[in-house]
Structures are given as structure tokens and as C-alpha cells.
UniProtKB/Swiss-Prot annotation:
GO MF term list: structural constituent of ribosome
Family the entry assigns: Belongs to the bacterial ribosomal protein bL33 family.
PROSITE patterns: RIBOSOMAL_L33
Originating species: Rickettsia prowazekii (strain Madrid E)
Entry protein name: Large ribosomal subunit protein bL33
Length: 56
């Protein structure tokens, strides 16, 4: 049998309020703080800050 994966999937939601999101894997044991990336938002056609939210 395969080992149980310890990584958690999280949504990175755009702070521009467009509803665009990226999905990333995060290991909660090694990365204790919330993720935030500056990535491209297709709706506003700019790089904006994306912050972590839980996947529902």
C-alpha cells in the first residue's frame, strides 16, 4: 500500500476580488504560515497578490 500523503490542497484567491484562484499543495508541518503569492490574474490582466484560503 502507498503511504498517506501529508500535503494539503489550498486555494490561492485573488485579492482583486475577481474570483480567480490557483490551487497549490502545502505541507502543514514545514510551512506553518499562510501562503501568499504574486501571480497573474487573467480578468484584470495584471499581477496581483493571491492569499491562501481553505478548499471547501
Amino acid at each position: 500500500m502507498a503511504k498517506k500523503n501529508k500535503n494539503v490542497l489550498v486555494r490561492l484567491v485573488s485579492t482583486a476580488g475577481t474570483g480567480v484562484f490557483w490551487v497549490k499543495k502545502r505541507n502543514p508541518r514545514t510551512q506553518t504560515e499562510k501562503l501568499s503569492f504574486r501571480k497573474y490574474d487573467k480578468v484584470v490582466r495584471k499581477h496581483v497578490l493571491f492569499k491562501e484560503e481553505k478548499i471547501k
